[in-house]
Structure formats: C-alpha cells, structure tokens
C-alpha cells in the first residue's frame, strides 16, 4: 500500500501478519522525503519491504530510522511521473495552513533585501488549492504581493536563475530540487521544517535568516531517481502470476 507510517497502516500490516505469518507486506513511501520523517521509523507493524524513490532516502532511513538494509528498496517515483517542472518555477507555494504569517513575510523581505538588482524572475504567490477562498490565506497573499512590488528592482524577465519558494513542513522542496531548481525554504518552525545536512548530505544549504534557507542539490537523482526501474510493477506482476 502507499505507506506514510500512519498508525492505522501499521495496524493493518500487524493484524494481517497475525492472521497469516507467511504473508509478505509491501509499503511504498510515495512522496519525496520530508525533512524529519520520524513517522517512518521502523517499528512493529512496519511492512516487510519498504520502497523509496532514491538511494539517499534509503541510506538515511537505514542509518537513522532503524530500517534493516534488506527491507528497503529503491524504485521509480511514479507519483511524480506526470508532474511538470514548469509548475514549480518562479512560484511561492503557500502551505495548507500556517500560524505565523509574519515569519513568512519577514523571511521573503530578508531574501529580497539581499538579492541583487535584476537577479530574479518575477514570481507569483500561489495559495493552496483547498484554501483559495480562505480569508487568512487571501490576506497573506496580498501582503506578499505587496512585498514583491516593493522590491521591483530585484526582478527582470531575462534572468536564468530558476527559483521555487516553499513554506513549512513540505516535501515540495525536494521535488523542485530534483527538477534542477534552487529552492528558498521558509521555515516557521526550523527544527522540524528545515532540511539538515546531518540527514540529507546532498543538499547545499545557505542560511538567509533564522527562518529561511536557500537550497541547491549537489547531484540529481539521489532523492527522486527517475531513471530507476519500476520494481513495484514487477513485484505485482510476479505476485499475480503466482495466484
């Protein structure tokens, strides 16, 4: 099943094994890795084999989250097969929810204050699809749009610098990085939101202020390996032939 380490998923696997001890369970961590994926720690009820979408994710899970190396495999990141790089370029993605809008506005201000004139392409602020009519999100977007207008000297239509801006606890940062973009990550709660080189060694991290960090990827394909084989499809085919 698509596996996120949720309690009910572990319960399903655990109860299935009680009924049939020879049953082999599979989980697919179908998202790009989050900054601190503690919910995926290997424990009672974890699947017999977990599929992840990149070698560095496998390395991190085995080193820090207790996964035996023989119980975790890499596979094609099929969730992102239909994603389009253009949908990440020059966009500031607002999260599903937020508490401290001031941190978001201050961090964007800090980043733009430090940017050189005409170094950036103008970007748009995008409200989460579920929150497009939410007044709190609409007001924050308006405030961010005003900040962008205030820093109009920073923008041009000719910059080759491709940037994506994400906010909070989100795996979208990794997706954008794997598309070859730079990522500004605004982290209202840096301890949980920020990617750390302690876990994720292939990300170059530059601090902008206490709540925002600029990322670049040292080598593509380490977290979302679009060149890998779809092992899940192969396993399902083999299991179907046995039945």
Question: Model-found features: residue ranges?
Answer:
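Catalytic binding pocket for nucleotide-activated donors in carbohydrate/polymer assembly enzymes
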Residues: 47, 65-74, 141-142, 171-233
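Active-site and donor-binding regions of nucleotide-sugar-utilizing enzymes
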Residues: 1-76, 171-173
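A donor-sugar binding/catalytic signature common to diverse glycosyltransferases
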Residues: 28-29, 37-39, 61-62, 154-197
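N-terminal pre-catalytic "stem/leader" segment of glycosyltransferase-like enzymes
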Residues: 1-14, 104-106, 121-122, 242-243
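Conserved catalytic-core segment of nucleotide-activated headgroup transferases in glycan assembly
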Residues: 67, 73-141
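Short, charged/polar "capping" segments at the starts of alpha-helices
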Residues: 8-10, 35-36, 57-61, 82, ...
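Nucleotide-activated donor-binding/catalytic signature segment of Leloir-type glycosyltransferases, i.e.
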Residues: 136-153
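Hydrophobic/aromatic residues located in beta-strands of well-ordered beta-sheets
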Residues: 25, 50, 123-125, 183
């Amino acid at each position: 099943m698509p596996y996120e380490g949720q309690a009910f998923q572990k319960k399903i696997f655990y109860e299935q094994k009680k009924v049939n001890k020879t049953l082999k369970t599979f989980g697919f961590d179908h998202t790009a890795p989050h900054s601190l994926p503690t919910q995926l720690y290997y424990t009672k009820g974890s699947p017999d084999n977990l599929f992840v979408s990149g070698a560095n994710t496998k390395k991190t899970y085995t080193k820090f989250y207790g996964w035996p190396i023989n119980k975790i495999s890499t596979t094609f990141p099929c969730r992102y097969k239909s994603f389009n790089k253009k949908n990440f370029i020059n966009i500031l993605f607002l999260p599903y929810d937020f508490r401290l809008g001031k941190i978001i506005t201050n961090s964007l201000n800090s980043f733009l204050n430090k940017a050189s004139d005409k170094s950036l392409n103008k970007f748009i602020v995008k409200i989460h699809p579920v929150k497009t009519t939410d007044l709190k999100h609409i007001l924050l977007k308006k405030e961010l749009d005003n900040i962008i207008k205030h820093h109009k000297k920073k923008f041009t239509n000719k910059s080759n610098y491709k940037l994506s801006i994400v906010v909070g606890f989100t795996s979208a940062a990794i997706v954008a990085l794997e598309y070859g973009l730079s990522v500004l990550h605004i982290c209202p709660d840096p301890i949980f939101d920020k990617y750390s080189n302690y876990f994720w060694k292939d990300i170059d991290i530059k601090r902008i202020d206490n709540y925002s960090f600029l990322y670049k990827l040292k080598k593509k394909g380490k977290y979302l390996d679009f060149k890998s084989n779809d092992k899940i499809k192969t396993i399902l085919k083999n299991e179907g032939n046995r039945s």
